Amino acid sequence: MNNHIEALSYYLGAFVDELTRLNVCDVVISPGSRSTPIALLMEQHEGMNTYLHVDERSAGFFALGIAKAKKRPVALLCTSGTAAANYYPAVCEAFHSRVPLIVLTADRPHELRDVGAPQAMNQINLYGTFVKQFTEMALPEASEAMYHYARMTTQRMIASACLAPQGPVHLNFPVREPLIPDFSLESLWDKGRGEYTGVVQQGNAVMPSEYVDSLVGRLSHMKKGLIICGDDSHSEIATFATQLAEKTGYPILADPLSNIRSGHHDKTMVIDCYDTFLRNELLKETWKPDVLIRFGGMPVSKALTQFIKKQTKAVHIVVDESGQWRDPALVATEVVQASDIAFCSALIEKMPVMKKNDWFRMWQHINEKTKETLREMETYDTAFEGRVITDIVRVLPEGATLFASNSMPIRDTDSFFFTSDKTIQVMANRGVNGIDGIISTALGASMICDPLVLVIGDLSFYHDLNGLLAAKLHELNITIVVVNNDGGGIFSFLPQYEKKEHFESLFGTPIGLDYEHVVTMYGGSFSRVNGWEQFREEVQKGATTEGLHVVEICTNRDENVTLHRKLWAKTQDVITTSLQGESK
């Protein structure tokens, strides 16, 4: 028997088997020659689920979506050359959104590097600082020591991806020809296997009792507090944060991605309209918290970030399991390295019950006044983009997922996703906030989250049209709501809008595309709605039937800005009147 083929088969077989033993059971594969042995072994292993995606850029985001939804590592596999470079945007997003991806790139052997060989480039540390760890795997050798090495390296890399903060890792595999493994070999998956795996298990760190006692003592004298919950908070944060809020009397400013705004838990302490009322100058100048406790990433709301930045005299506690200093407002006074749950549990156990005071009632009152005013948009006959969110939430069933694209959809979700007793999971790519790969990420998530509705602008939709292929290949169920304002709607809210001479060509960027034929090409249904009743019917139909459904609602960018500002202005008047009335 060819010793090379035996070494290739057993060495890479040990690697693939170890992935499955470590619960990495999903891999997104893009076709290529140099990655052949790994791809074939993955397809052959009964413990591995393989998904084909021919476009590596889309494949990267597709894997990201699966990993976000499953909350566990997902592997990516491609051949050498620019194929690997196309993963870069998804790797960047995974790193900053703390999603564990196992990036596997095949490569030419060392003798074919830097000598002009085809499809060969430097793949060492290809993703730079956007992966937690890189390793160049050794060439396959036929020895028990090397089979064990393959498994131990796999364990190290998976541990790195899964320990806080989670993130992507990169393994580069140089492989010599011939590339076809021998599946007739006995015990193909058993080489190098030990009785136990060596992955580090991370639990919730125990809070030091001295710090907890000190903090409880301080908080007991701080009546004006805020609990701020951003994205990537722990899945059980709703239960623990609301219990902490009840103990302290501090309102919870819940980002939509915290998933605290919806569900069966008590939402008495939850504030959902802060993005609107924190624009009020009188409120910002007069409401001064003593302490802010923040979980998860920075919230979507710019108004909230600016409010936080002004609180230079407050105690500002950032809770982060990894201990990273995530404080773009530059006002944190303490960073506590602990899980959200460990932190909340420790305080809940020892905090005395602090009665709800005027501070909480002020936030609750202004929140309700703001919500009443914002709901006036439900009387608008025109296609107002904010109403897209409220009408989707209205028809989504219990347990559904709303995926919000970047740019305007996530901001409208922040402003118009009000508290609901239905459990509706909200997802988005808020690592580096790009508009690329949104369709692919949502489709990856839809493999686990069903039904899933994606809200996306026309430019973001165009940007990732290739991603629709996954819906066809893997028979996925998704409803995509395309808010088509023929351009980049968010720029109409920014100072660039005043530069009328060059605005449309540089920022508005209308592309004037009809997406109907593209959607049908990928086997989906397409509907362009006129009116809110038809909109709700189409979204509901899409969420309750199988397949790819695209619902397009056309809006006017200028009109949308006017309506947003009209709502904000009326809300500011209501808030100012209410605040002035309270001060008398």
Curated annotation (Swiss-Prot):
Homodimer. It comes from Bacillus thuringiensis subsp. konkukian (strain 97-27). Keywords: Magnesium, Manganese, Menaquinone biosynthesis, Metal-binding, Thiamine pyrophosphate, Transferase. It catalyses: isochorismate + 2-oxoglutarate + H(+) = 5-enolpyruvoyl-6-hydroxy-2-succinyl-cyclohex-3-ene-1-carboxylate + CO2. NCBIfam families: menD. GO terms for biological process: menaquinone biosynthetic process. This is 2-succinyl-5-enolpyruvyl-6-hydroxy-3-cyclohexene-1-carboxylate synthase. Belongs to the TPP enzyme family. MenD subfamily.
